[in-house]
């Protein structure tokens, strides 16, 4: 039987890795020769989950057409986020929870996209719909994906469906979702050994907001002071990026996974936009952003609206 590769996006997070493993297992149970693979390095958070539930990580690939004709995408659909040669293979299925953009196929396909916080939440339904029991280890990985994407149910992207799925999966996995989740998030928040350049580029995205060119980077931490103790060095490398890219604003967001607040470090000529957006005053280029954890829902739209009004 011809093999089908199942994979998440480049720079994979825990959902991209764990949902690829979980869906490949379901497809195998249903008779398909499916193999999970990954398009990037495994993060510390994801490795913690794999080690905890004693599951081997998928192998790394950059291209897929040299191996297979057919693939399944999880946790993404946009071409630029997928395998380098995605245009050379047939996409059989997409299981996702993001916007649909830059995606078209030459053949009909099974496409399932739901407005939930995590792909694994959808997969939990699909296991039930197909009458397939979820193994303890796989349930643990799916739970890990939901905890990661929802920041232990605190993110505004989290839905009641995500919480309900997590409770079911935690029971199967034999763990307490809260205590295990905090342990996993802490593992992901261990930034020791990272250079300042790595810290500001671990999870950075560039945006055009009105006439302003803005970059927003975000890291999770158990204590924001562990990161901000290096503020002088951070400002130095951020200023270099601002100059190199011609940015109007670089906002470096350090999110405390225990309090679910963030501290924003704003550098650039348009740093005052952060003050207007959040009704705060920057002191030494920083401000506390109470209750802000999601770049997608709580930072990008708010700053965009502010810049458009300037």
Curated annotation (Swiss-Prot):
Catalysed reaction, written as an equation: diphosphate + H2O = 2 phosphate + H(+)
Enzyme Commission identifier(s): 3.6.1.1
Enzyme class: hydrolase
Taxonomic superkingdom: Bacteria
InterPro entries per record: DDH_dom, DHH_sf, DHHA2, DHHA2_dom_sf, Mn-dep_inorganic_PyrPase
Cofactor(s) the protein needs: Mn(2+)
Binding residues annotated for Mn(2+) 1, in chain numbering: 9, 13, 75
Cell compartment(s), UniProt: Cytoplasm
Key word RNA-binding present: no
First-listed, main subcellular location of the protein, grouped into a coarse class: cytoplasm
Molecular function in Gene Ontology: inorganic diphosphate phosphatase activity; manganese ion binding
Sequence positions that bind Mn(2+) 2: 15, 75, 97, 149
Pfam families hit by this protein: DHH, DHHA2
Bridged cysteine pairs (disulfide): none
Cofactor note: Binds 2 manganese ions per subunit.
Keywords from the UniProt entry: Cytoplasm, Hydrolase, Manganese, Metal-binding
GO CC terms: cytoplasm
Metal-binding listed as a keyword: yes
Family named by the database record: Belongs to the PPase class C family.
Classification via HAMAP family: PPase_C (MF_00207)
Protein name (record): Probable manganese-dependent inorganic pyrophosphatase
């Amino acid at each position: 039987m011809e093999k089908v590769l199942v994979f998440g996006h480049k720079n994979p997070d825990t959902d991209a890795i764990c949902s690829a493993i979980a869906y490949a297992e379901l497809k195998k149970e249903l008779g398909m020769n499916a193999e999970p693979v990954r398009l990037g390095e495994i993060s510390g958070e994801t490795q913690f989950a794999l080690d905890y539930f004693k599951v081997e990580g998928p192998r790394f690939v950059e291209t897929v057409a040299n191996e297979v004709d057919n693939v399944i995408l999880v946790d993404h659909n946009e071409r630029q986020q997928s395998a380098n040669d995605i245009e050379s293979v047939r996409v059989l299925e997409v299981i996702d929870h993001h916007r649909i953009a830059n995606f078209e196929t030459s053949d009909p396909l099974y496409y399932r996209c739901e407005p939930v916080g995590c792909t694994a939440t959808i997969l939990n339904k699909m296991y039930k719909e197909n009458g397939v029991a979820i193994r303890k280890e796989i349930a643990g990985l799916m739970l890990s994906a939901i905890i990661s994407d929802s920041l232990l149910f605190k993110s505004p992207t989290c839905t009641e469906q995500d919480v309900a799925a997590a409770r079911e999966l935690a029971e199967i996995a034999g763990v307490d979702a809260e205590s295990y989740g905090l342990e996993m998030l802490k593992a992901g928040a261990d930034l020791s050994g990272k250079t300042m350049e790595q810290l500001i580029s671990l999870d950075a995205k560039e945006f055009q907001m009105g006439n302003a060119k803005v970059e927003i980077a975000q890291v999770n931490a158990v204590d924001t002071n562990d990161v901000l103790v290096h503020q002088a060095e951070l400002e130095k490398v951020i200023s270099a990026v601002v100059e190199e890219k011609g940015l109007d604003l670089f906002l470096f967001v350090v999110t405390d996974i225990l309090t679910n607040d963030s501290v924003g470090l704003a550098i650039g000529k348009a740093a005052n936009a952060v003050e207007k957006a959040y009704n705060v005053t920057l002191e030494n280029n920083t401000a506390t952003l109470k209750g802000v954890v999601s770049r997608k829902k709580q930072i990008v739209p708010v700053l965009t609206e502010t810049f458009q009004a300037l």
